[in-house]
């Protein structure tokens, strides 16, 4: 019975995925993922990126966000990306494959960033989901805390932070923590984000000194 349930669930997901208008548009435009549209909507409202910026992209694979950011920061900008999964090379993107939770990977990422502070940190990281919130939410919150720690290390004063968060236990505390570090904080649910998903995006601008 369990196998049948998993099979039915997988079939529903595949049907939903391939009938999704954003998946279809991404395929037509040659984009790496539908996440491109989420970031485009956020950029239209919040103007996180400008030409020449240096951006850190956490949870980057397959590259939808890096692909979008590259169009906004131009040839003089720089993207340092990291993911546990592989990602095909992209012009203007310095990609590190590894588990961001491991100290050696984090150190390698910091070395790639170098001495200069960055203007934006974005995180689309998410754990492998089990479907059980009591298991998934703590794993997700651990990742977003690490992303915020990265901001503390590398984000310049006045810099911006965008992070995907799954609503649940720990969300309100995390939001308060971000508000203490940034001058303006908003919560976004882009149209391209599936309605049934717990995910929202916290947009934090103007890192405080």
UniProtKB/Swiss-Prot annotation:
Keyword entries, A-Z? Cytoplasm, Methyltransferase, rRNA processing, S-adenosyl-L-methionine, Transferase
**Which SUPFAM superfamilies does this one have?**
S-adenosyl-L-methionine-dependent methyltransferases
Going by the entry's taxonomy, the superkingdom of the source organism is recorded as Bacteria
A UniProt-annotated Pfam family: FtsJ
Q: Which EC number(s) are documented for this chain?
A: 2.1.1.166
Main localization category: cytoplasm
Reaction(s) this enzyme catalyzes, per UniProt = uridine(2552) in 23S rRNA + S-adenosyl-L-methionine = 2'-O-methyluridine(2552) in 23S rRNA + S-adenosyl-L-homocysteine + H(+)
Q: Where in the cell is it found?
A: Cytoplasm
Task: Give coiled-coil spans as residue ranges.
Answer: none
Which residues, if any, are the signal sequence?
Answer: none
Q: Single GO molecular-function term?
A: rRNA (uridine-2'-O-)-methyltransferase activity
Is S-adenosyl-L-methionine tagged as a keyword?
Answer: yes
> Where does it sit, as one GO cellular component term?
cytoplasm
Q: Which InterPro entries match?
A: RNA_methyltr_RlmE, RNA_MeTrfase_FtsJ_dom, rRNA-MeTfrase_E, rRNA_MeTrfase_gammaproteobac, SAM-dependent_MTases_sf
User: According to its UniProt record, which residues of this chain constitute the active site?
Assistant: 164 (proton acceptor)
- Residue sites binding S-adenosyl-L-methionine per the record: 63, 65, 83, 99, 124
Q: What does this protein do?
A: Specifically methylates the uridine in position 2552 of 23S rRNA at the 2'-O position of the ribose in the fully assembled 50S ribosomal subunit.
Stated family: Belongs to the class I-like SAM-binding methyltransferase superfamily. RNA methyltransferase RlmE family.
The protein's name is Ribosomal RNA large subunit methyltransferase E
Species in which this protein is naturally found: Sodalis glossinidius (strain morsitans)
């Amino acid at each position: 019975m369990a196998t049948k349930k998993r099979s039915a669930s997988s079939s529903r997901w595949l049907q939903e995925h391939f009938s999704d208008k954003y998946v279809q548009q991404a395929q037509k435009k040659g984009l790496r993922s539908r996440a491109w549209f989420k970031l485009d909507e956020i950029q239209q409202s919040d103007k996180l990126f400008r030409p020449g910026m240096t951006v850190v992209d956490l949870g980057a694979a397959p590259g939808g966000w890096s692909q979008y950011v590259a169009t906004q920061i131009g040839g003089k900008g720089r993207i340092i990306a990291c993911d546990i999964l592989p990602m095909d090379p992209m012009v203007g993107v310095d990609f590190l494959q590894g588990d961001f939770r491991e100290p050696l990977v984090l150190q390698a990422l910091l070395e790639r960033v170098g001495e200069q502070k960055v203007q934006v940190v974005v995180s689309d990281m998410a754990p492998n989901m089990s479907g059980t919130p009591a298991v998934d939410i703590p794993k997700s919150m651990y990742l977003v805390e690490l992303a915020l720690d990265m901001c503390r290390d590398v984000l310049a004063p006045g810099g911006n932070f965008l992070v995907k968060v799954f609503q649940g236990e720990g969300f309100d505390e995390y939001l308060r923590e971000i508000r203490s570090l940034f001058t303006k904080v908003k919560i976004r649910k882009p149209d391209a984000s599936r309605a049934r998903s717990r995910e929202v995006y916290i947009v934090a601008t103007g890192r405080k000194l």
